[in-house]
Amino acid sequence: MLTSGHTDTSRGRSGSSDDDATGHSPGRHSRHRGGGRPRRRRRFAAALFGLLGVLLAVAVPLLPVVQDTTTITWPGPGPLAPVNAPLVNFQPQSLTATIPCAAATSADARSIQPASLLATTPPGSADGAAVAMVLQVADGKLTLISRGQALGTFSLGTLPLGTIPVSPERCMITISSDATGTTASAGPHQFVTVDQDVRPQVTGIYSVLDDKRDPVKGLAVQITPDTRFQSTPHPIKLAAIALAVVAVLISLMLLHRLDGRIGRRAPRLLPSGWWRPTGRDATVLAVLAVWVVIGGITSDDGYILTMIRTSSDMGYVGNYYRWFNVPEAPFGWPYELYALWAEISTTPPWLRLPSFVMGGVCWMLISREVLPRLGREVRRSAAAGWAAAAVFLAFWLPYNNGLRLEPVVAIGSLLALCAVERAVATRRLLPLALGLLAAAFTVAATPTGFIAVAPFLVAVRPLVRLLHQHASVSGWPAVIGPIFGAGLLVLVVIFADQTLAGLLEATRIRTAIGPSLSWFQEATRYQELFSDKADGALARRFPVLL
């Protein structure tokens, strides 16, 4: 008969064997051997569903979307008249124009000053000449200007002399402009060729041409707005997203079953007394509740509110004020939830309720999960608890009472920390996978969310040892599959209605325009904190110095 000491030695020597891992000899406990096949099935299923979740999550950025497209055409039905059509992205994806040569000659003949045949900003605009495209004619000479630069000229006076082998009635001036270049021609003569992006800003279509005095037959302007980011997921993409979520959930449930081989018995998710309120809880929640009503707004509340209110029209959350309104992706998924919340009301107390709820959850995690892990003296000290409450409020009130995403970072980082601590303490992998899931969504919320990765880096040695212990019993595929699936599941949220190409383009635009600070420029934040600007207010400076 094997003693318990021999059982432990047997498990350590051959942990990869199902029989040795239980400490029983094959012969004497053959009645229990039937459990080996279900365990092998669970290992195989955990690896299979975990790998399936990983593959589907990675495939989501590459799957198709349905792009909303629109075209502005001019002139419309009725009398010829200018049209206002300001583009949110400023530049169009493409612009084409066809203007009869006879109309240009007619407008030139009746105009004393240069006649604007086509302009993309209103005449007389103070800054229009620097950003618009203008085709003008003066004394029989065509000139195409884009963004303040003369691209080329052509003399119309040669047309009646037969230098162009078409009749003046059939002669057309054509313009084509997109991201790859701009061309212009009069009949078969091309007088503009630019192999770079000189697309103009478009606020409308304006011209001096008059359909009652000028022969405008054949006049046409077509503008395609840049709607690359206005898309919805294709049914194939929706199916992949749903399957990825289901596969990862199943793999995590199977991982929970496999945890019993190595890990200690799973403790209750929320121990008894977790919800029992204390005086500190009442004080913290009361202060947070009062601050919802009387607290000052954060510096970006109005900025973010406009972004989320325009998202319903755009089809995505973009930076309305900067970067040509490209999507916030890969960051900013909480803004999608804020946009739904703001549809109910935009009053400040209502908009602050999410941060109030997250503040309450953060305090519960700090007081119930973090402080007790700091030792018996801290756990039993009322002074330590009240000090923690004071520091928490000192940070939360000036920084997190609004629509900024720091509350999401705070709650996500705390969840990751608590999950890592529980994984190491219980020797179970499910908390590790859930913590990685929380960290991934925190990182995808805002760049400062990378702080949620810190608990994994600090505990890397015990976590690697834990992975080896479980892999020796269940195999690496069954261990790594569900964990990787949990970490990559955030991709289905980031790329739910965007593509990888769209995200890369949005990132390129933000980086090119800036400002974009490198990691070694972190000191800039502290310069702002001690400046005489709003970021240097005493309320913001105090908790950092504390």
Model-derived segments and spans:
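Transmembrane signal-anchor helices characteristic of membrane glycosylation enzymes that use polyprenol
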Residues: 45-121, 125-133, 137-140, 273-301, ...
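Start-transfer (signal-anchor) and selected internal transmembrane alpha helices
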Residues: 3-11, 18-65, 227-291
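Active-site lumenal/periplasmic loops and adjacent helix-entry segments of GT-C-fold
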Residues: 287-380, 394-403, 410, 532
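Membrane-embedded helix bundles of polyisoprenyl
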Residues: 364-365, 379-461
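Perimembrane helix-loop-helix junctions
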Residues: 422-423, 451-485
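Juxtamembrane membrane-water interface segments that cap and precede transmembrane helices
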Residues: 218-230, 332-345, 508-539
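Membrane-lumen/periplasm interface segments of specific transmembrane helices
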Residues: 476-524
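Extended repeat-based interaction scaffolds and adjacent low-complexity, acidic/S/T/P-biased segments
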Residues: 79, 83-95, 100-231
